[in-house]
């Protein structure tokens, strides 16, 4: 009904009750125009009986309402007698509104038979869900601090514990571990998950052999990609039996060359790779995966540590030529520089594809070769008209002390995304043997938590990886190649390992680091650690692992190339 008001028993009542308006009309038509007060139930019941028999009741109600709505719109549109009746109704300051649109709305709603869901939110459940999301983010931000990264577990250069990674820190109890939460695909592409299962999965993902630092990356697409890449694997990359045997073969080569040189040329400087042997399968996996991504040319820059191993076991330098250099037999075409500064070029076969490899000559000054490599890559990209930066890849290798201590690193990173200097991203590898010459305590070598913290100045993600887990190392290599090719940005791999000998083979590290080296001397080699793992998994037998070592040693005795992927260079690709 329409909206004028009357006072009944001293209460304001709207005209929504037709009995009231009809009673008013009856009073008005009977000459009793006044405000009704004190309407008791006896009179009201009598009125009900009257309303049932009067012309104002029953089906005529709708007719009277329509008349009154017409009167509200245009008083002249109704009969003069009705106009006089409506004019005599009590006046009110409220604006009267027709009821027909309201009735039409409810009729339409009934026809549509629409049911709206009402969500009742439990404040306690909502608060718990917020804490679950905070728990997940704690692992994404700080899980790397509790990752199993140090092969010898000697010096806790990280914080000893991270309280945010404990569910109790977020006010959960042991009873909550069996509670299921709807996380709406926030992690692991799961809708519902028990808190206990979530805690276990997060620990496996972010606190295993890989510690990923990526939450400082501001670009959401890059951050989501990195996050998904690690979480989809639960930090447990899957490798085929053939791939595992190949990884062991490459570790055997890295270990075998160093042992051979140490026995054949004792005391000669070679800046051994021992302890960081996983560097060799890391580099070869980068080449293989880059080739699958369309890379045709890779330029490397590195210092002295592990360089001889890189020359023989990756680029395919003949061991015989290296032995001649140790013996002092220098070619007249050479510069006369030391053997661990020499450059090299070769072709590397990946299936039916070839990748041209170049190792830049290294000046003795640490890190100076990095901008040289970037310039060489940029010029090759220009020569190939490689405007998308897909065909030529830069890979630079650093030491843990040098990457944190040399100013040229910052200068090179600063130019990495500048339009005139960018090469579409560089893969930067740190051979982190946790010691700089004779200093291992990070409180004495740097002011940052990690040696790679400088990477954060350009928001480069950092993959910390345990050097005793070659499968994790290979996964890090693939991840780095894919990230670089997709986003054209720098990415760091922090290969955390150790140095089995002194800074060079003439040094005795027990004199300066007796505690550290008493542990290292008892620690098995990376080859031995992985061989035992594969034997336990049933991938190979102990006899096969030993045979692998013997075959490599025989190849060195013959002086032949030991890289099966080596190919004669295409003359058009020669440097």
Give the location of each predicted region.
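Extended, charge-enriched "interface" segments that sit outside catalytic cores
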Residues: 85, 89-278, 295
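Cofactor-binding active-site loop characterized by glycine-rich and histidine/acidic residues
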Residues: 296-459, 463
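Hard-cation-handling environments
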Residues: 526-527, 537, 541-575
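Active-site pocket-lining segments that scaffold enzyme catalytic pockets across diverse folds
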Residues: 256, 260-320
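Flexible glycine/proline-rich, aromatic-decorated loop/lid segments
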Residues: 425-428, 432, 440-459, 495-528
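Subset of Sec-pathway N-terminal targeting signals
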Residues: 42-43, 48-89, 93-96
